[in-house]
Structures are given as C-alpha cells and as structure tokens.
Amino acid sequence: MTQHLHFRCPCCHGSQYRTSAFDVTERNPLGAKCIFCKSTMITFDNVALQIRTDHAPLDFTK
C-alpha cells in the first residue's frame, strides 16, 4: 500500500515542494519545504485544522 501525502504551504498556499535530509526537524519530520518561499510545508489534513484555529467562524445574517 502506497501512502500519498498532499502538502500545502501555509504562507503562499503553494503545493510544490522539495524534501531534504538537512531540513528534517521535530516539527518537519519529512523535511518538506516550499520551492517558492522556502517555508516548511504542512500536510493537507493539518491545513483544515489550521484554518479552523486561525479564522473566526463567519456568521451570515440577512
């Protein structure tokens, strides 16, 4: 079984990345960095969690 991970950049919202053994840290265990802004990439399942914690819910009223 092959597991495919989808990464997203939290800064520029890009999805292109490179991996390097030199970039492996506790917060970035796979060593993935954005090729555009060099930020640490996050997995797509963490993007939804970050959006929920960073933004207040929007209430639409008429």
From Swiss-Prot:
One Pfam assignment: YmcF-like
Protein induction: By cold shock, 10 degrees Celsius (at protein level).
Protein family membership: Belongs to the YmcF/YnqF peptide family.
Note: Uses the non-canonical initiation codon AUU, which may limit its expression.
Name listed for the protein in its UniProt record: Protein YmcF
Species whose genome carries this gene: Escherichia coli (strain K12)
The gene coding this protein: ymcF
